[in-house]
Every structure is written in C-alpha cells, then in structure tokens.
Amino acid sequence: MSGAGANYWIARLLAVIAGLLGALLAMATPFLPVNQNTAQLNWPQNSTFESVEAPLIGYVATGLNVTVPCAAAAGLTGPQSAGQTVLLSTVPKQAPKAVDRGLLIQRANDDLVLVVRNVPVVSAPMSQVLSPACQRLTFAAYFDKITAEFVGLTYGPNAEHPGVPLRGERSGYDFRPQIVGVFTDLSGPIPTGLNFSATIDTRYSSSPTLLKTIAMILGVVLTIVALVALHLLDTADGTQHRRLLPSRWWSIGCLDGLVITILAWWHFVGANTSDDGYILTMARVSEHAGYMANYYRWFGTPEAPFGWYYDLLALWAHVTTTSAWMRVPTLAMALTCWWLISREVIPRLGHAAKASRAAAWTAAGMFLAVWLPLDNGLRPEPIIALGILLTWCSVERAVATSRLLPVAVACIVGALTLFSGPTGIASIGALLVAVGPLLTILQRRSKQFGAVPLVAPILAASTVTAILIFRDQTFAGESQASLLKRAVGPSLKWFDEHIRYERLFMASPDGSVARRFAVLALLVALSVAVAMSLRKGRIPGLAAGPSRRIIGITVTSFLAMMFTPTKWTHHFGVFAGLAGSLGALAAVAVASAALRSRRNRTVFAAVVLFVVALSFASVNGWWYVSNFGVPWSNSFPKLRWSLTTALLELTVIVLLLAAWFHFVATTNGSAKTRFGVRIDRIVQSPIAIATWSLVIFEVASLTMAMIGQYPAWTVGKSNLQALTGQTCGLAEEVLVEQDPNAGMLLPVSTPVADALGSSLAEAFTANGIPADVSADPVMEPPGDRSFVKENGMTTGGEAGNEGGTNATPGINGSRAQLPYNLDPARTPVLGSWQSGIQVVARLRSGWYRLPARDKAGPLLVVSAAGRFDHHEVKLQWATDSGAASGQPGGAFQFSDVGASPAWRNLRLPLSAIPSMATQIRLVADDEDLAPQHWIALTPPRIPQLRTLQDVVGYQDPVFLDWLVGLAFPCQRPFDHQYGVDETPKWRILPDRFGAEANSPVMDNNGGGPLGVTELLLKATTVASYLKDDWSRDWGALQRLTPYYPNAQPARLSLGTTTRSGLWNPAPLRH
C-alpha cells in the first residue's frame, strides 16, 4: 500500500467494515424471521348447519381435520330428506368436477361415503352409521397422506381384515381436497361434536419482525456508508469532480421535440401490451392482500423476486387506475431512454456519431420503432430497457474516469433491472462486457489501497437488492414459489427459444408488422455493426471500447433471453434503448466515410427493403381493444399485387441497381448539385428512412382508428376523455341488457305464442334445436367439436348460452333452454334442426309493431342459434298498408356477433330502418341440407340498455379477466386476504379469441381464479353491446350466481406468529 493510501485509512476501514457488514446483512435478510398472519377456517358457524364460502387462493389447506357425529347422518334419510345427499363438502355438489377436486361426505344409495378427489376413502352402510355402535366419522388430510375412520365400526366378516376398525388411508400422492367453503344440505341446530378445522396456507401473508427491520435498515445504511467511503477512495486520484450530467442535458433540439411529440401522442392513442390488465389487477389487489400475489396463476404465490416494480405501480394506482395515468411512469422512462441515448450514448461512441445527423435520426427512429409496439404498457420491459442503458452509462463512466463508485452504482442498477422481471436477465450483459477494463482499474487501484476496501463496497452494492426483494418474504417461501412456477409452467427451456421467433413470424399481434419490423431492424443494425467491426477492427470514426461494448451487450442480451421461462415477442421490448444505440452505430457504419462503395450501400438498401417487405407479410394487428378500428388489422388491401409483393419487387430492382454499380458504373462519382448531395445523403440512410416510415405508419394507423371509429370507443378516445374526468374507460361504452323480456316487440294481430311462425313455418318447429349448442372453437372448423373443455365447462364468453332443455315446455311448447334469461313462458322459439333426413326449412314470421322512434333504443336484436350465413336470416320492414297487403318495403341483414352454433344476439341498428317503417318481420331460409347447418330464432326485441358502469358499479367484486383489466379501471377486482378469495359477483371477459386463448391460463391446472369460481359459482352471460360499434365483439359480461345462494362468507380465526426464514408448513400443491 502506498503512502497516499495510508492517508485514507479511515475511508479504507469504513469501506471494509461497512461493505462486508452491509453485504452480510443483505444476504441474511431472506433467512431472518417474519411475522406471519395465521388463519383458521372453523365450522360450523352460528351453531347451525349453515353453508359458508371460503375459496382458498392456494386451493388446499396445509392441514384439515373433520369430525362428524354419526347421528348427523340421520338428516340424509327419510322422505323429508329427498334431494338432500351431502352431509358435508368442501365444494358445492352441483359444480362440475366437484367430486374430482373436493371432499364430499355424502349419501350414495344406502351408504355413507367419504370421497376425496374422486377416490372413496371409507364408506359404511347407513344402517350401521345410524346404529348405536357408530360414534363419529373422522377425517384428516395432510400433504403426505389422508386418513378417515368410522369410530366404533369394524369391517364385516366377509372383509379382507374382519374385525379391524373401519378406516381408510391414501398416500403416495397429495390428496388434499380443494376448499371453496363448507357446504351441507342439512339445516337446523348442529349435533354435539361436529367440527371442521382447516389451517389456511398464509405463508406469504407476512411482515418483517423488529429484528429483520433493524437488520434491513442497518444493511441499507452500511451500504450507503461503504459507497461514500469508496467515493472518498476514488478522489485519491487527484482529479477534479466531473459533471454528472452533460452540459446540454436540458437543452431541447428539433429532433428531441419530435421524439417527445411522438411519445406523448402515442401515450394517448397508442396500443398497449397484452399483460397490462394482468399487472394492473395485481397491483390494485396487493394492498388489501398484504403482498404482491400472482393473481391469475400459480395459486396466489408472490411475484417476488420480480415484484418490486409492480409495488411501485401499486403506489401509483392510489391516485387513479386509468390507463393514461398508470402509464405515466412508462412515458417518463421512454423520455429518459431517449435522453440517455442522445446525450450519453451517442457522444461516447465517438466524433463520427456525435457529428452525424444521420446517426441521431437513425437512433431516434430505431428507438421509436422498438418502443412504440413493445413498451407502451405496464410490463417491466420499459424499466429493463432503461436499466440496461443506465448500467452501460455507469460502466462507461467508470472506464472513462478510472473510478469504482460508478461500478457500484452499475451493480445496484443492474440488480434492480435483473429483478424487475424475468427478461431483466438481459442486464447481466452490461456488466459482463466490461469485465476486462474494470478488472484493470481494480488491479491498478488495489496497489494503492488493497483489494478488500475496493471490493467490499461493490459487494454490498451488488447484494443490497436482496433487502428489497425479501423485505417481507422468506427464503423458504420464495424457493417454494419458484419451484411451483417451474413445475406448473410455462417453463420453457433455453433450446425452445425458436418458439419466440416462430411467434414473431405468425400473422397475429405477436408477429404484427410493427413488432416484426422492430426485431428485424434491430438484427440488421446489429449485423452491420458486427460486420464492420470484424472487417476493420472497429467502425471508422467511432470509439472502439464503447461501440464494442454496445454490440457485446446486445449479443449477450439475445443469449440471455434464451433462459427466460416464457417465449413471447413482447420481451424484445428490453432492446429499445440498445436499438437506438445500435441505430447510431449502423448509421455511421453505412455512411460514405465508412462504406464508400455505392454498390455496398445499395445492397444495404436492398436488405432494408427486404426487411420491410418481410415485415408487411403480416397484419397490422394489436392486442384486444387496441385493435378496434385499426386499418388492415386482418390483412392489407390488394390491388394488382399485394403490398408485400410490391416491396419484394422493389427489393429486386434495387439489387439490380447494385449489380449495375458493380459491373457497369464501377466508379463512385460525387454529386455535383445541391439536390444530388441531398439525394446521396438520403440513400446513405436507408435504415433511418425505413424506421421513420414505420413509425409514421404506426402512429397514423392508431390515429386513423380513433378518428374513423368516432364516436365509438377506441383506446385513444378513452385516454383523451380521461383528461376531462371520464375515467371509466370501456365500462361507459358497453351497454347491458339486464332484462331482455322487457324489450320484446308485440305482434300486430297474432298471439305471442303463434306469431313467430304465423306466416310460414316449413320444417321450423318449437323443438327444432339440439340439446347442446356449445360454441365451436375459434381455431377449429365449424362443427368439428363444441367449444368446451374436457371437463364439460365452457371457457369463453357464452356461459349459459350453450343450450339445454327445460322440464316444463314454454309458451309455444318448446323445451329449449333460452339464453340471456329470456323467459320461456313469454318467449317462443322455432328451429330448423332435425335428425335423420334433412329437408329445406323456411320461416316467415308475423308482423311485429315498431314503437315510436323517440321512445325506442338504438338497436334491434334477435336471439339466434345455429350455423348459417348472414343472408339466410333477414328482417323485412313495411308500413301498415304494406304489411296489410303483404308488400314489405325492404329487407336488411343482421350483424352476427358471436360464436356459432351457440345462442347469440343478431343486431341491426334501428337507424338503418327507414323512419316510415311501422312493422317488421323475420325471414329465414335454411336450404343447406348439411346436418350441422340449422337456424333457431326468437322474436325481435329492442333492448332497454344501461351502461356496464351503471350495472356493475364501483363496489361489486368483479372477476376481471387479465386482458380486460386496463380497459375497466373503475370495476373493483375481487380481493384476497389471509389466503382466502373474495367471492366475485361478475366476470368480464375479452373478445372470443382472447377468452379462448387466455382462460386456460387461469384454470385449475395453472392455479388461477377460474379454478375457484367454476366450483363455487354458476356463470350466466348477460346480453351486452358496444355503443356505436354494434357489430364489435368487445367481450362479454357474466353474472356469477353461487350454487348455494344462502352461503355467507366464512368468519376466520386470525392470529399472528413468528416464522423462521426456513419454515415450510407443507409443499405447495399443484
């Protein structure tokens, strides 16, 4: 150690002690004890046979003990007990798959049977159960085994072990039953000894103990002290303090203004990402829950170690949950990224980049081309993109100044970025690529102070993030959660990375024009930068170190992305900041100073054109509501050639021009005129032209959608309206028909029961409807199979519309079960379905009276089922005289919104019908003799409509599917606390494609809320429509009705206890 080092002995001592202690406390944080909130579900409550609801978010209890006196089974016998079969169950007996997933103690014929997850554990004849010998039935369930016994009874003489106590046991599998409450068919006072006690898994409902709090505070303070000491050691080099921010940091140029304008406008009209509703709902519910649970999957386990960013969003949501407000941090990150690119990255790349306008414009175009389609939401990609840039800037400052405090800052930022989300793994590259220069600095400085005083603060900085991650959780809990997520999935391997690129080349929002171009342009810029660096050792005019590190970070980030457990294209959003930096590198690389050959520049232009052509071989599609009204969202228009073909042909022409330059015009003539100079400069920046063209295309597309759809709802309109105080989004535009019977039109001269087929009804009959009309899947041909899961439960928005039969015939003798709560006693129905020989069917209804237009709603609706073409069902209108003479004035086709053959509502705006019309009738022709082709109709009606906001309101607990959360900011997601979910009253689903794709994510296999609600509640679709966009499939509203309507929320026995960081009550069942 030198003499100068001896003068800093206090700083050295502080750096060593504070750094090592800070790191030790940070690493000890996961293992320190926490205060756990405990909860016990005990039943009976109120001393009566009263069913209670207690849907466990983790599905099962850590331990369950049940004791039932044998005398209690007497309530299941006798003529007065008809229909009463369940003595006790943890799931309603009416629920699909109740026997497969729950515990039921029930009467089966003349036996009392205890069944757990479809496995009979023990049973006894009712005669023996009610005999004096039988004392009680006991049951215990733990993760390793379940046991049940009829105390007092023994196996009979014909059994394998006669005289042995009548008991059963199952092990070798986690048989713990799912619990959504305690239900019984019995009533009245309870017998003595009846007891149900479940220990609810609340391992994640915890808070730090005083010891852990003190340790965390000391860990943070000591880390700060260590960093101050490291700064003092850095100052020993004798150099003066350098500005933290460049001198022109706050100045705004024309390009800055343009980028700010685009980002600000896109903030309002731009498309969002698919997971925004997922993340927003988690954030909204976390405060009441006490931790950031993964609300839609994985049995309520916490998001940690990736949840700290979502905690910030939870705080942000205290002001308002509107989209425009919740994404303000994202906008701030976008602006910060651009400021770093333009003021830190480009100047550090060297004089050629700093002096080149093409470099700045290309950097801006590349940055926007990636940011706009991938980062305009609540996902963590924006903060990861920013974190990567900040880490690189800190590393570059360390290399430039030969100081180590920036290294420590880079470690903190890198760790925060790493734990912002699974894709934060890309931040590792920012540190790895600079290991060589940083080790050189450390080696040089250690000669002066020794290695330990320099390394200890960096170690503390690298580990301090553990305090944030494990502040209220334990090592055991997080380890169990990570193992469960890996087991449940999705958990793809590194060699499955090809799936991400396969999705990128699908004609879907995942592989849309914008996303595909963003990634391909990034790869082109990276390829050019790598090629030039390999060919000449460096890109001429650029600083070798910083430019190589930018390239290295990008390459390592692509490699690191291989290890993320999911493979979605929105993960490419982490490259937004790097894309801008690479854009600057590529612009300099292809400039005339670096790439003098016109042939080579022309070939590069052809490559860029090919990338554009490949990008447009897709759709201009966006996720869910962001796609409303967007032009070419399904396909691009074709004139003589498709746009992709035209771009490909242009690519060939440019390649032929390059061949001309190679074989004929081999000299590089210089431009002689000012116009020629400008043309030459433009040709030298093809990637800038392409990126800015795509940016303009994207912004114009979403702006056109907002203007073209007006006054109908769009994302842009909703965000702009939020500035005026209209903050409820789509809930104010979805119109709900609560009572479809109230809007039914009356026939002019025929009884209601006969009017539907009074003019003509050939092969249309009251029972011409199959019993099952479940919808076909979106992705399968019509009629291939019904859109139901293997367990028989629908997953889309048509719950309650899949048909069935009634025991009592309706007004016209039909036994068909009608949708949307249509009353069969008031609503006739006719259908053309028939088994056996098929014949042509025709229907002409009687005339129905139209009400006065000023007293009618905006829409005319007919509930229909079947598979048919639009032209096969029509509405004819007439005046009174025209109807009397049988001369209709004209006809209209309906908009058929929904999935066939399920019941859905055919729609026709009332404004389309001439004002002179006073009567209407239905006309249907089924001339297709295919057995799966049929039509069923109910009478026309004009719905009485209220907004979804008025119907659902602010307070009712709602099951918001994860795609819809951002579009419905005023609806309250159902809460969970102490391991128990609140029972929702409504469910809001996305459009049919989204419902089919995403409902499986939330089902019982993944540990989501759908696996709870389908056992506890019956879903019925409520008719709804999107205002002024009547033919739009916006989604669906479902009313959730408990199978046991009188069941009340259970009262839990709460407590608090202290748990070690290694405590584990039981494995998480999955």
Swiss-Prot record:
Enzyme class: transferase
Domain of life: Bacteria
Keyword Hydrolase: no
Subcellular location: Cell membrane
Main subcellular localisation: membrane
Gene Ontology terms for molecular function: arabinosyltransferase activity
InterPro entries attached to this UniProt entry: Arabino_trans_C, Arabino_trans_C_2, Arabino_trans_central, Arabino_trans_N, EmbABC_dom1
Membrane topology value: Multi-pass membrane protein
GO BP, one annotated term: cell wall organization
UniProt keyword annotations, A-Z: Cell membrane, Cell wall biogenesis/degradation, Glycosyltransferase, Membrane, Transferase, Transmembrane, Transmembrane helix
Transmembrane segments: 10-32, 210-232, 247-269, 399-421, 425-442, 449-471, 512-534, 547-564, 574-596, 603-625, 645-664, 685-707
GO cellular component: plasma membrane
Enzyme Commission code: 2.4.2.-
Function of the protein: Arabinosyl transferase responsible for the polymerization of arabinose into the arabinan of arabinogalactan.
The family this protein is said to belong to: Belongs to the emb family.
Official protein name in the record: Probable arabinosyltransferase C
